[in-house]
């Protein structure tokens, strides 16, 4: 890392707690909508932990339809990990490359990420919430 990037990073660290708190608030608002949703499953957080919410991953049995729906509301949504780690070329020489991991392989096709970052405006959060509510 260059000195310039290190200096920028050090300056940004002063904002980290606020950014994480904003992400947590956004995630909680999305989770409260999804707790009773019939077609989507919210991510869970273990008790006594604090999630950083780098990604907000929603499980959908129809991810393409969900991504299209969110896109129709001008919300970026995408498959989070379309290729499971053990299937990446870099692991082709490892023993796991030939193994099957059915849960991992299934989830890689179902987990969709939506914006949760600290810079979302109130209007954007409301638009995401409305899009989540209207999806069936």
Each PLM stretch: what is its role?
Residues 1-136:
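PLP-dependent aminotransferase class I/II
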């Amino acid at each position: 890392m260059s000195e310039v990037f290190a200096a920028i990073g050090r300056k940004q660290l002063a904002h980290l707690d606020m950014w994480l708190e904003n992400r947590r608030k956004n995630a909680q608002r999305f989770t409260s909508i999804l707790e009773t949703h019939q077609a989507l499953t919210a991510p869970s957080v273990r008790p006594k932990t604090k999630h950083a919410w780098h990604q907000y991953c929603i499980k959908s049995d129809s991810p393409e339809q969900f991504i299209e729906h969110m896109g129709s509301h001008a919300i970026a949504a995408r498959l989070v990990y379309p290729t499971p780690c053990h299937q990446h070329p870099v692991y082709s020489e490892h023993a796991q490359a030939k193994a099957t991991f059915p849960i991992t392989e299934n989830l890689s096709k179902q987990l969709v990420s939506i914006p949760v970052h600290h810079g979302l405006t109130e209007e954007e959060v409301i638009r995401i919430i409305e899009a989540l509510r209207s999806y069936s």
